[in-house]
From Swiss-Prot:
Keywords: Activator, DNA-binding, Mitochondrion, Mitochondrion nucleoid, Phosphoprotein, Repeat, Transcription, Transcription regulation, Transit peptide
Superkingdom of origin organism: Eukaryota
CDD domains in the record: HMG-box_TFAM_rpt2
Processing and modification events after translation: Phosphorylation by PKA within the HMG box 1 impairs DNA binding and promotes degradation by the AAA+ Lon protease.
Positions where Phosphoserine occurs in the chain: S56, S61, S160, S193, S195
Gene: TFAM
DNA-binding interval(s): 50-118, 155-219
Transit peptide interval: 1-42
Function: Binds to the mitochondrial light strand promoter and functions in mitochondrial transcription regulation. Component of the mitochondrial transcription initiation complex, composed at least of TFB2M, TFAM and POLRMT that is required for basal transcription of mitochondrial DNA. In this complex, TFAM recruits POLRMT to a specific promoter whereas TFB2M induces structural changes in POLRMT to enable promoter opening and trapping of the DNA non-template strand. Required for accurate and efficient promoter recognition by the mitochondrial RNA polymerase.
Protein name: Transcription factor A, mitochondrial
Length: 246
C-alpha cells in the first residue's frame, strides 16, 4: 500500500500536460505533453497514460484564442493573453460555472482512469515506471518550461555583438557547409577594426534596452494573468556605458 501511495504521488506530480502548466495564464502548449515517461509494455497494454484535464480558465482561453487571433492577426500571443484574461475577469459567474463544471467532470473521469491503470500494474511494473519517471522528469520539465515560455511570448534574450555579426554574415554566405561558413565568419570578425566592431557593439547595447523594455511589459502581463511564478526576483537594468563582451 505504501508503494502504491508513493507511485501515485509521483504520477500525480509528474503526469502534467502543457495545458495544466499554463493554468491561469490564458494559453496552452500547442501539443500536449506529459512529464511521465511511459514504457512500451505500459503503453501497449494500457493504451497510454491519461493527461490531466484543462482547468476552467485554460478551457476558456483555448476557445477564445483562435477568435482573438482572427480579429488581431498581427498581435503577439502575450497581447492576446492579456485581452483574454481581461475578458475572463469580466465574465459573469453564471458563465464561468459552465467551464468550472466541465473541469470537475473531466477531473472525475481522469481520477477513475488513473485508478484503472494502477489496478492493472504489478508491483514490479510500478517500481520500473517510477524509476523511468524520475530519470526523465528534469529533462521533460525543462523542455516543457521552455516551450511554455515561448508560447507565452517571453522576449528573446539580447544578443552579443559577435552573435549579431554572425547572424548577419551567415545569411549572406552561400558556399560551403555551416561549419565552413562559421569558420570563415569568425576569421572575418577577428580581422575587423575596433571602429567596425563598434557598430555591432552599439547594436548589442540597443538590443539589451529592447530586451529590458519587452521583459518589463511581459512581466506586467504575467502579473495580470496570475503567473507571478514567471517574474524575475531581481531585475538588472541596462547600464548606459556597459562594456560589451565579445
Amino acid at each position: 500500500m505504501a508503494l502504491l501511495r508513493g507511485v501515485w504521488g509521483v504520477l500525480n506530480a509528474l503526469g502534467k500536460s502543457g495545458a495544466d502548466l499554463c493554468a491561469g495564464c490564458g494559453s496552452r502548449l500547442r501539443y500536449p505533453f506529459s512529464f511521465a515517461y511511459v514504457p512500451k509494455w505500459f503503453s501497449s497494454s494500457l493504451s497510454g497514460y491519461p493527461k490531466k484535464p484543462m482547468t476552467s480558465y485554460v478551457r476558456f482561453s483555448k476557445e477564445q484564442l483562435p477568435i482573438f487571433k482572427a480579429q488581431n492577426p498581427d498581435a503577439k500571443n502575450s497581447e492576446l493573453i492579456k485581452k483574454i484574461a481581461k475578458l475572463w475577469r469580466e465574465l459573469p459567474d453564471s458563465e464561468k460555472k459552465i467551464y468550472e463544471d466541465a473541469y470537475r467532470a473531466d477531473w472525475q473521469v481522469y481520477k477513475e482512469e488513473i485508478n484503472r491503470i494502477q489496478e492493472q500494474l504489478t508491483p514490479s511494473q510500478m517500481v520500473s515506471l517510477e524509476k523511468e519517471i524520475m530519470q526523465k522528469r528534469l529533462k521533460k520539465k525543462a523542455l516543457i518550461k521552455k516551450r511554455e515560455l515561448t508560447m507565452l511570448g517571453k522576449p528573446k534574450r539580447p544578443r552579443s555583438a559577435y552573435n549579431i555579426f554572425i547572424a548577419e554574415r551567415f545569411q549572406e554566405a552561400r558556399d560551403g557547409t555551416s561549419q565552413v561558413k562559421l569558420k570563415a565568419i569568425n576569421e572575418n570578425w577577428k580581422n575587423l577594426s575596433n571602429s567596425q566592431k563598434q557598430v555591432y557593439i552599439q547594436l548589442a547595447k540597443d538590443d539589451k534596452i529592447r530586451y529590458y523594455n519587452e521583459m518589463k511589459s511581459w512581466e506586467e502581463q504575467m502579473m495580470e494573468v496570475g503567473r507571478e511564478d514567471l517574474i524575475r526576483r531581481s531585475i538588472k537594468y541596462p547600464a548606459k556605458n556597459d562594456p560589451e563582451k565579445f
